[in-house]
């Protein structure tokens, strides 16, 4: 199976070590050990941790533009599945859902975070 892999919180190619980067790399490796071909779809980082609404809107616009770029690349040889690791309110996935709708492929999420206290914004 061909899998497009994406980590909006922190790209697995980041030069800065962290648990998120390590887990992302290990998930990619586990998918590969399962016989899949895994390609990192984008290094785009959507994290905005300060609650800056202007920056969040800017990241959404940039993420949607990145989704268009990624879609252009994937349309020729689409993956069978999109896999997003660790999205949450401070690091939403602006790319995967758009690409999956366009390509009509499954959208899979690992380690999604939900904060009931943030449900109303």
Each predicted region: which residue ranges?
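N-terminal subdomain of nucleotide-sugar transferases
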Residues: 1-46, 77, 105
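Short glycine-rich, flexible loops that bind phosphorylated cofactors or substrates
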Residues: 12, 90-91, 116
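Conserved strand-to-helix beginnings and helix N-cap segments that scaffold or border functional pockets
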Residues: 17, 93-94
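Hydrophobic/aromatic ligand-binding patch that stacks against planar heteroaromatic rings
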Residues: 30, 95, 99
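Glycine-rich, highly charged phosphate/nucleotide-binding loops
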Residues: 54-74
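Short N-terminal targeting/anchoring amphipathic segment
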Residues: 71-91, 105-110
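Active-site proximal beta-strand in glycosyltransferases
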Residues: 98-116
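Short, intrinsically disordered, charge-balanced linker/junction segments flanking boundaries
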Residues: 117-121
């Amino acid at each position: 199976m061909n899998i497009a892999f994406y980590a909006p919180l922190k790209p697995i190619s980041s030069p800065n070590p962290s648990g998120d980067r390590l887990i992302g790399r290990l998930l990619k490796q586990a998918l590969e050990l399962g016989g899949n071909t895994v390609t990192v779809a984008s290094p785009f980082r959507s994290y905005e941790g300060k609650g800056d609404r202007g920056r969040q809107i800017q990241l959404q616009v940039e993420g949607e533009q990145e989704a268009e770029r990624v879609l252009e690349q994937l349309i020729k040889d689409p993956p069978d599945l999109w896999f997003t690791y660790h999205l949450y309110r401070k690091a939403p996935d602006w790319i995967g859902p758009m690409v999956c709708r366009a390509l009509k492929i499954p959208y899979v999420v690992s380690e999604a975070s939900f904060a009931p206290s943030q449900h109303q914004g």
